[in-house]
Amino acid sequence: EDYATILLGDCSDCSKMKELYKDFTYDKVLVLGLGLGLIPETLKVEKSCSVVDVIDNNQELIDYVNFIDDSINIIKHDAFTYTPDKKYDFILVDLWWGNEDITDEMLSNLENNYKNYLEDNGKMLIPILYKSFEK
């Protein structure tokens, strides 16, 4: 049983993590936002990325997610002001935003702050939820 199931119970979306990243070919990855550690852990353990750095400024969350692979480098810092010390093949902004939570200025700030830290042909992904449902 994988740790996502243990941590989150019967989370069908979480257990699909391997499938979501099956074609992932990047080696040096920066993740903005730790969450429950599922994405960094999948990238390091399942995809064998040589570098997985994670930026998060929530010490309580960092302390809670202490089960992830020791070679994942968690950096306590604000994602909007952090300056990387290396270049990455892939930067994933995983800050759990809906379209009402983020401004064009915030997006521009992220792009301007991180674009110079992408390797040639590197990519930066900023997924944003555009639709939500309420009952």
What is the role of each PLM region?
Residues 43-46:
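Aromatic pocket-lining residues of Rossmann-like dinucleotide-binding sites
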Residues 18-22, 40, 62, 80, ...:
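Short amphipathic alpha-helical segments and helix-helix/interface helices
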Residues 27, 50, 89:
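Conserved acidic residues
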Residues 1-28, 37, 41:
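Class I S-adenosylmethionine
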Residues 58-85, 90, 95-99:
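S-adenosyl-L-methionine
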Residues 97-135:
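C-terminal substrate-binding/active-site "lid" region of AdoMet-derived donor-dependent transferases
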Residues 51-56:
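Conserved SAM-binding motif I beta-strand of class I
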Residues 31-33:
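Class I SAM-dependent methyltransferase core
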